[in-house]
Structures are given as C-alpha cells and as structure tokens.
Amino acid sequence: MKLKIDCIRKRHCYCHCLVSNVYKSNFKFFRIGMAYAKVLRRIREQKTNYNRRKSMLMGHRDFITVQISNENTQVQVIHPELTGDKVISSAHSRFLIEKGWKGSRKNIPAAYLTGYFAGKKALANGTNSAILYSGTRQYTQRMAAALKGIIDAGLEIPADEETFPSSDRINGEHLKIKNDVKNIKSSIDTGAKSK
C-alpha cells in the first residue's frame, strides 16, 4: 500500500506502477488511471498487424499470404470483403507428393512450386494482380520463392527482383535429395490447360 501511495505522490504514469509490481495487488484502478491497458486479442496472439492490414486494405486489391509450417507450405490468394476475407485460390505443398516430390515440402523449391500452382489456380479464377501481405511474419527467402512462383505463373505483383532467391536455389541444386522442378512445373501447366 505504501508503494501505491508513493507512486501517486510522484505522479508517475501507470507504466511505473506496473514495473513496481503494484498490479499484482487487489487494486485495479489508480487515481492516475487504469493499471491495465487492454490489448486486442489478435495482437496479443500475434495473428494480425493492424497497421499493415489497414495500409493493405486501402489499396482495394487482392492479396497473397504465404504460411510455412513445420512440414508444409500454403499459399492463398484472398479477396478482402466486409463480411470477411474470401479465398480465391489456395495451394498446399501436399500436392507435390502426387507429382513425385521427394524430401521436404517447406524448402525453397517446394515453396516456389506451391506458389506457381496457386498462381495458375488464381488465373483460372479470374485474378490478374495482387499484392503480398506478410502480416506479422517476416519476409524470408521461402516467402520470396513462393512470390516468384506466383509471378512466373502470370500474376502481376509489385516486387523487387533482387529479393528473390537465385535460380540454382529455386531448382534445388543445393539439396541432397534431387527433384526435377521443371518436370513438375510442366505437369502443373498441363493440368491447368486441361481444366
């Protein structure tokens, strides 16, 4: 209690009260204001960066998300609406198993082919341009490889060519388990033409 009174006398902000462990007591409000400032749930869970999302929505364009998990890569082309975001096309790296892929499905060549597949599906659904929305995630080489795959599929996306991985890494020449990226890419093309 003495610590609380000293804090009010010095007229410190509630941040000082939090540091001095007053927030652990039964007092929820202080004379100088609340001891707890509410943080939105999606910010707390690190799911949404609202500043990035607001600037992305101001452009009135479709956007691309790349999600890389422990085993797979998922690329989605999304159209924002007031009722909620609508997925136009989605590609998951599990489809690579059907094409004869061996090894990891989250590396740079797998991300490139997943992005290429998502781009072909988006073109078939009538989407010609989009922007990348990374959300709370950092822009990595695997995300750049997926973005290059979407651009190679034919979508118009503003991106800097210098950020993309080299063609040797996209073709998987640095990997121990070799996969034929060009054959899988051509099979994606033939599958898109048949539909």
Residue ranges with predicted function:
Residues 7, 13-17:
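Cysteine-centered motifs
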Residues 4-7, 31:
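Generic short N-terminal amphipathic or hydrophobic helices
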Residues 23, 27-195:
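Ribosome-associated RNA-binding proteins
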